[in-house]
UniProtKB/Swiss-Prot annotation:
SUPFAM superfamilies: Carbamoyl phosphate synthetase, small subunit N-terminal domain, Class I glutamine amidotransferase-like. The keyword Repeat does not apply. Small subunit of the glutamine-dependent carbamoyl phosphate synthetase (CPSase). CPSase catalyzes the formation of carbamoyl phosphate from the ammonia moiety of glutamine, carbonate, and phosphate donated by ATP, constituting the first step of 2 biosynthetic pathways, one leading to arginine and/or urea and the other to pyrimidine nucleotides. The small subunit (glutamine amidotransferase) binds and cleaves glutamine to supply the large subunit with the substrate ammonia. Its EC number is 6.3.5.5. GO terms for molecular function: ATP binding; carbamoyl-phosphate synthase (glutamine-hydrolyzing) activity; glutaminase activity. InterPro entries: CarbamoylP_synth_ssu, CarbamoylP_synth_ssu_N, CarbP_synth_ssu_N_sf, Class_I_gatase-like, CPSase_GATase1, GATASE. Residues 1-174 are annotated as: CPSase. It comes from Thermotoga maritima (strain ATCC 43589 / DSM 3109 / JCM 10099 / NBRC 100826 / MSB8). GO terms for cellular component: carbamoyl-phosphate synthase complex; cytoplasm. This is Carbamoyl phosphate synthase small chain. Keywords: Amino-acid biosynthesis, Arginine biosynthesis, ATP-binding, Glutamine amidotransferase, Ligase, Nucleotide-binding, Pyrimidine biosynthesis.
Length: 392
């Protein structure tokens, strides 16, 4: 018989369910992911550090877990919420059940919760602080402690998942890329190696002299958790890299950090984008890509003198029709740097990609490597390779 568990939110609401995984309690920002598959990649994605993830699909664990579909060296989410778990997987690749995987990494999770109601609450009120507990089953007590817990805003969480030393992969590659590692997904590393790169992962706290010693042909600014505005040292480093005119590419958090480095602003989204079927328009070609997303912050186009393109609260059907008409937008940062918006979300108009007109640098907010998700955007890595070859 499963032990009783309690999920409490900072707005005072609470949900009882059954314990899934380890016993104990965990605190974090409550967010939702709409993927029907890919739960193992979600669990192991370092960008979810500090977050309790609600899976909107009702059955989780059908195909178990395996030794290949991992994005880091272990589970990184703070907690997990599902409607119903499956403890007898049906897949030839499975090496362990989903509940046993949670227990292996001591992850506190809950099942039997109305995840549809929970998702609607997050959509209406926004992502909020929450906690799962098997030891404190008093709703008033747990809600009080949730309210007292730290917010994700202003927190540097990258230090929890960044490496402590340089890690070299594919040393015989045709060209070299430093990955400024704030919690890089292994799928990104796989795609860099796929296009022939020697990969050098470095701590997110290095300085320009550390980068110069490695003499890379390019630098990729990785994904990662937390508030980008809190990573002041990394932002300064990116400014220095731009002065050196080293080819730069950014993914997710890396996109936000590049935007901040040129004088832009970031903002916290109401509930964010987390799923594997988000439509994004490439404004340069008019092509629509189906992409994987995991971000709760975004770059503000208004900080480049451009209009707001939409919001999470607008009617998606009406907004999408209007956004389809937009072509490439060019703005100027407060530092006088020309910024071209290259990609936008067709769901809500969020800025999903940019290019610096006078510097060898570009970035995307979505995840081109997917893992999980469609491969529409994998050309990002070939594009980065071409940029490096042009500059080199």
């Amino acid at each position: 018989m499963s032990k009783k568990a309690l999920l409490a939110l900072e707005d005072g609401s609470f949900f009882f369910g059954q314990s899934l995984g380890a016993e104990g309690e965990t605190f974090g920002e409550l967010v939702f992911n709409t993927g029907m598959t890919g739960y193992q990649e979600v669990l192991t994605d370092p960008s979810y550090t500090g977050q309790i993830v609600v899976m909107t699909y009702p059955e989780i664990g059908i195909y178990g877990v395996n030794d290949e579909d991992v994005e880091s060296d272990g589970i990184k989410v703070a907690g997990f919420v599902v409607y119903r778990s499956v403890d007898t997987p049906s897949n030839w690749r499975a090496t362990m059940s989903f509940p046993d995987y949670l227990k292996k990494y001591n992850i506190v999770a809950i099942e039997g919760v109305d995840t549809r109601a929970l998702t609607r609450k997050i959509r209406v009120k926004g992502a909020m602080k929450g906690a799962i507990s098997t030891v404190d089953l008093d709703p008033d007590s747990l809600v009080k402690r949730v309210k007292e817990s730290p917010s994700i805003v202003g927190r540097d969480l990258a230090g929890l998942v960044s490496p402590k030393e340089v890690i070299v992969e594919n040393p015989e590659g045709d060209f070299s890329v430093v990955v400024l590692d704030s919690g890089v997904k292994w799928g990104i590393l796989r795609d860099l190696k796929r296009v022939g790169a020697k990969v050098m992962r470095v701590p997110y706290s290095v300085d320009i002299d550390d980068i110069k010693k490695l003499n890379p042909d390019g630098v990729l600014i990785s994904n990662g958790p937390g508030d980008p505005a809190a990573l002041l040292k990394t932002i300064r480093l990116i400014k220095d890299l731009l002065k050196e005119e080293i080819p730069l590419a950014g993914i997710c958090l890396g996109h936000q950090l590049l935007g901040l480095a040129v004088g832009g602003r970031t903002y916290k989204m109401k509930f964010g984008h987390r799923g594997i079927n988000h439509p994004v328009k490439d404004l340069r070609t008019g092509r629509v890509l189906i992409t994987t997303h995991n971000h709760g912050f975004a770059v503000d186009p208004k900080s480049f003198g451009l209009p707001e393109l939409g919001s999470e609260d607008q009617d998606a059907n009406v907004l999408t029709k209007n956004l389809q008409k937009i072509s490439v937008l060019e703005g100027i940062s407060p530092q006088g740097i020309k910024v071209e918006i290259t990609h936008i979300s067709l769901n809500d108009g969020t800025m999903e990609g940019m290019r610096l007109v006078d510097y060898p640098a570009f970035s995307v907010q979505y995840h081109p490597e997917a893992s999980p998700g469609p491969h529409d955007a994998k050309y990002f890595f070939e594009e980065f390779k071409r940029l490096i070859k042009e500059v080199r």
